[in-house]
Swiss-Prot record:
InterPro entries listed in its UniProt record: Tetraspanin/Peripherin (IPR018499)
Residues exposed to the Extracellular side: 45-68, 115-200
Main location (coarse class): membrane
Gene: tspB
Homology family: Belongs to the tetraspanin (TM4SF) family.
Places the protein is found: Membrane
Transmembrane segments: 24-44, 69-89, 94-114, 201-221
Cysteine pairs bridged by disulfides in the record: none
Record's keyword terms, sorted: Glycoprotein, Membrane, Transmembrane, Transmembrane helix
Record's protein name: Probable tetraspanin tspB
Organism: Dictyostelium discoideum
Alphabetical list of Pfam families matching this protein: Tetraspanin
Membrane topology designation: Multi-pass membrane protein
Positions annotated with a glycan in the UniProt record: 62, 143, 159
Residue ranges annotated as Cytoplasmic topological domain: 1-23, 90-93, 222-235
Length: 235
């Protein structure tokens, strides 16, 4: 068996300083996730009625509710947990470091889940699924939901080949359509590329988080090997 004793620095400082530095980076990234999640929740709240009326697929429901809420919650936990991580690392609190590492593992799993969901939605071409639901609702009795979305997105009809329902497409006082862009192009520009960015960001943040966990584990091992009183962690 390989002896790993000499692989861990003898001085905890060389472990806790990088741990604090990486936690600071994660704190900033946590704020970014909070902002992205808040924007996503606000944006997709306008799709709530559309999702209900269209009897949307699971992928569409995940896009409008699960993904943005997941990003927001993970961001909030990052902001809180990284502050705690900096404190317990600086004070070399053994119990705190163990709890911190366990919580980071849970968040890492959640982050992988959200990132994987975002990439899956991107690869499954969720915009096409939105288009199918859009056409169904446009030709149904509750097409006023589509008119609200058109006003919000500032677009007219789903695409150039979709049916031209006279009740849809916002018009001015002269009956002229207010917007020239089709809704598929607007939604595609706002969703498709951003889903890929969320997935890529989740992978990047996950790597940094994994490094933090390694430093925390090494620091735990070093603290356990150092002579100390049992009451040290509770001071």
């Amino acid at each position: 068996m390989v002896d790993t004793t000499n692989l861990i620095p003898n001085t905890p400082r060389y472990l806790k300083v990088p741990l604090i530095a990486f936690n600071t980076i994660l704190w900033v990234l946590g704020l970014v996730l909070v902002i992205i999640g808040s924007i996503g929740v606000s944006f997709f709240s306008n799709f709530k009625d559309f999702t209900k009326v269209s009897k949307a697929s699971a992928a569409l429901s995940n896009l409008t509710t699960g993904a943005p809420a997941g990003v927001l919650v993970i961001g909030i936990f990052f902001v809180i947990l990284t502050v705690i991580g900096c404190f317990v690392a600086g004070k070399e609190k053994l119990v705190g470091l163990v709890i911190y590492t366990m919580l980071m593992l849970i968040i890492l799993v959640a982050l992988i889940g959200v990132g994987g969901k975002a990439l899956t939605l991107h690869n499954d071409d969720v915009v096409k699924q939105i288009g199918n639901a859009w056409e169904d609702v446009s030709n149904g009795p509750k097409n006023s939901t589509i008119l609200k979305l058109e006003n919000f997105l500032k677009c007219c009809y789903w695409n150039s080949t979709s049916s031209r329902n006279p009740l849809l497409c916002p018009k001015d006082s002269k009956g002229i359509p207010k917007y020239t862009d089709t809704c598929d192009s607007v939604i595609s520009s706002k969703i498709s590329s951003n889903l890929y960015l969320v997935g890529a960001a989740a992978v990047s943040i996950g790597v940094i988080e994994f490094i933090c966990m390694l430093f925390a584990l090494f620091l735990i091992i070093r603290i356990c090997r150092a002579p100390r009183t049992k009451s040290y962690d509770y001071q």
